Amino acid sequence: MDEASHLPNGSLKNMEFTPVGFIKSKRNTTQTQVVSPTKVPNANNGDENEGPVKKRQRRSIDDTIDSTRLFSEASQFDDSFPEIKANIPPSPRSGNVDKSRKRNLIDDLKKDVPMSQPLKEQEVREHQMKKERFDRALESKLLGKRHITYANSDISNKELYINEIKSLKHEIKELRKEKNDTLNNYDTLEEETDDLKNRLQALEKELDAKNKIVNSRKVDDHSGCIEEREQMERKLAELERKLKTVKDQVLELENNSDVQSLKLRSKEDELKNLMNELNELKSNAEEKDTQLEFKKNELRKRTNELNELKIKSDEMDLQLKQKQNESKRLKDELNELETKFRENGSQSSAKENELKMLKNKIAELEEEISTKNSQLIAKEGKLASLMAQLTQLESKLNQRDSQLGSREEELKKTNDKLQKDIRIAREETVSKDERITDLQKKVKQLENDLFVIKKTHSESKTITDNELESKDKLIKILENDLKVAQEKYSKMEKELKEREFNYKISESKLEDEKTTLNEKISNLAAENSQLKNKIEDNSTATHHMKENYEKQLESLRKDIEEYKESAKDSEDKIEELKIRIAENSAKVSEKRSKDIKQKDEQISDLTQNLKLQEDEISSLKSIIDRYKKDFNQLKSEQSNIQHDLNLQILNLENKLIESEDELKSLRDSQKIEIENWKRKYNNLSLENDRLLTEKESASDKEREISILNRKLDEMDKEKWNLQESKEKYKRELQKVITANDRLRREKEELNENSNNIRIMEDKMTRIKKNYLSEITSLQEENRRLEERLILNERRKDNDSTMQLNDIISYYKLKYHSEVRHNNDLKVINDYLNKVLALGTRRLRLDTRKGEHSLNISLPDDDELDRDYYNSHVYTRYHDYEYPLRFNLNRRGPYFERRLSFKTVALLVLACVRMKRIAFYRRSDDNRLRILRDRIESSSGRISW
């Protein structure tokens, strides 16, 4: 139950608001007049019919909450932390002291303890940290700039591709907007047709109503005219049938429009497919780009291989020079031996012959060395020719760049032409919109004419029977004219169907051309894949040739080393011969003969080695010739591929020109057809005007219906023509976009090298400037750091004492914050226990009151306090008396009650205290955080 239903009169004034409910105040006040400002006056002004007023407590001026006074139950928290009482004076009563309370620590807080200054001391450490960060940042910058120089070139190329893609997306969005505009125009035309149909239905209803009125009036006038009216009604029924046929035709036209909308959707799907094909072509073009880059890399590798061959040839030249020097040294030694032999006259002629043989062999060796030198010179000439061929290829590439630029200009011209055509088409659409507005005006005029017809219809009732007969004759004539017009209309429909059939045939032809182009593209892709395979095979062959060549070079080096060893052995033997000649002049002839035989054998071995080397050189020549042939074949294949690509591009351009010519011819034919239609329309309009002059009210309405149907046909035709022109423009745009994309990519690939070189030069200049500026800034920072190092050395002595002060102040603040938190939790617990006790008491009272109202006897074990049974409000044996004038008691919870100033003041005071406590708490937390950071930084571990 609600609280207001149980309280007696004036009991709410004795309650105090709490977050849970109302609390009874003390019953110490009297019902006297207000004597002091703290006494609460009687708000009822002594109503006689109201119940007795409850005694109220005289409140003190400072009605703040004291946790020790309000709550009686003990706290459930741990008393490990002492309580802090800041502004509580010591109580004079020694008997009422709470022994559970701990000593007050505010006096300890007020002691003059030397506190640290964390902000000032932290600046030094922050500066040191900045110094270390600066050193690391320099290293990272130096490494990062090196990577950035390599990465920016790739990023610039990617940005170019991204910009092209964005431009293409923008063009596609514009085309979609144009498409939506045409669809909106189509919707407006459909709405206009619906309006015309509604008007036709309204006219038919008016005709029916007027015919009924005429029939009702003529029955009163004449009975003989009924037959004539029936005849007129039959004729009107026939006319209605004709109207139904016209409506059926209109429905057929609507169905045709639906079919056309489906065709539009199918064509949109085709557009999406074409866009997907464009994306595939783009991906194929990118693959071709990668292939070209791969070929360029192979050319670079081969140039590097040629350079390596040059280096190896230079090494061979050095080895040959060393051999020549050795041969010269051997000649000098032989000359010395000859002089010695001349001095010794006892030497025989056989030894002289041996010496001549040795000289001849040495001369042969020199000739072989000269031949090898000539071969090396020839190889160098071949290398120079290869380098010249490479330069020629580079010049051809530059020529291709210029050709691509000219083709780009041609494409720009074609783009301009297409844009002009698009503008013309837009102007035509504007003119057609103007025609639509003219038609709307004509429809309004027809509405006015209908209003006039309504007026004239009332006058037509007085027409005589003779005029009705003449009208019948005119109706027959008009029926014949309608038949003629229907025949013409059927002929026009046949012509339209034939043209639609021709248009479908042209569309099928265009689709066949598209398929052929796609097949050519697939063939080109297959050829490119074949060329890739050939290039890979050639690369593997060249790799094997390199390995064989290196093996042969290693074998030659080994042979040369063996030759050197043999030469050294011969030198040792010559020295031994000298010694033997000095020792034994008698045995010289025998030993020399043996030595000469050995030398002959050695010379034969050397000649065999030379022959082997010559064979190896010839094999190397054949390998080099093969390599040249393969290289020339690759060049010829590349030239053929490029020639084929150029031919394909020319064929595509010719096809574009042919398609443009076809479009022009189609446009001209469409214009001629439109003019013929206009002429026919004018002739028909003249015939209709002639018939309209002869007809009267009923025939006028039929004529209007026919005119409206014709206008609908014209609108449908215009709509169809607009859709056809739109689709043709879309096809042209797609073709031009594909050609543009190809040529742009080719141009960008060829211009990348020049742009990259310029970008790298600009970057190098910027890097130099940045390095100079960084060097100057580093010098200045070094000076500042040296000065600060001197200051830091002076401050190191004071750090130890400051660390102790920081630790002491940190733990002291932490301790006091925990103590305050514990005291706050105790207060909250006591308050909640008190609120629970009051709530349980209130529930018990409510149950007792319910039992009293229902006359339920008390149980034997009554748990309520005796105070509640003795009160004059809540006793069991005292009936609850309601006031007589209940309407005057407007101080319950259901009535608006005015707040007293005291409650507002207490609320404001509580808010101010909470604000102060929050401020102090925030400042203590900030101070704790600063001290913790300082302690961690001083201990050597930093956690960020």
From Swiss-Prot:
Keywords: Coiled coil, Cytoplasm, Cytoskeleton, Nucleus, Phosphoprotein. The modification Phosphothreonine is found at residues 18, 64, 68. Residues 900-927 are annotated as: Calmodulin-binding. It is found in: Nucleus; Cytoplasm, Cytoskeleton, Microtubule organizing center, Spindle pole body. It comes from Saccharomyces cerevisiae (strain RM11-1a) (Baker's yeast). Residues 119-799 form a coiled coil. Residues 23-110 are annotated as: Disordered. The gene is SPC110. GO terms for cellular component: cytoplasm; nucleus; spindle pole body. Signal peptide: none annotated. Gene3D superfamilies: 1.10.287.1490, 6.10.310.10. This is Spindle pole body component 110. Belongs to the SPC110 family. Residues 96-110 have a biased composition (Basic and acidic residues). Component of the spindle pole body (SPB) required for the proper execution of spindle pole body (SPB) duplication. Potential role in cross-linking filaments or anchoring other molecules. It is essential for growth. Residues 28-46, 67-78 have a biased composition (Polar residues). It comes from the Eukaryota.
